[in-house]
Amino acid sequence: MIVLEDLVRDRGSRYAASGGVVSSRAEIDAFLAALRRRRKFDKATHHSWAALLADGPMKNDDGESGAGAVILKMLEREGTQNRIVVVTRWYGGVHLGGDRFAHIVTCTRAALAALRDAADGSP
């Protein structure tokens, strides 16, 4: 599991990204449970995620409308199979409107780069 904390801060909201290898819904559930076991992440407002599995794509907005679709589209564009990307948000009290999608893209890009580096053995 890779975890990239404090990637974006905007109007009180904070974003992080996580990623890892998964091949089934059960592994997705285990990944999300492991992430939530981290005290800081357990207190987050949203854990939006997407994964491309052999059985097909899966996503969940976790209350952040449209977020899962944005993450999934980026996974599909990259052709990333059997990986999950989770974008976590701690809501800061101010609605961000469409800016939140730019933050989701930024976090997803960072997670995908970290997953590529991990697969390549890069530091």
Roles of regions detected by a PLM:
Residues 1-65, 75, 113, 117-120:
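C-terminal regulatory domains involved in ligand/effector binding and gene-expression control
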Residues 51, 82-91:
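Glycine- and acidic-rich phosphate- and metal-coordinating loops
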Residues 57, 81-82:
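Hydrophobic alpha-helical segments and their boundary regions
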Residues 66, 89-123:
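Active-site-proximal loop/helix of nucleotide/amide-processing enzymes and allied scaffolds
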Residues 70-71:
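Well-ordered alpha-helical segments embedded in enzymatic catalytic cores
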Residues 74-81:
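Short glycine/proline-enriched loop/turn "hinge" motifs that connect secondary-structure elements
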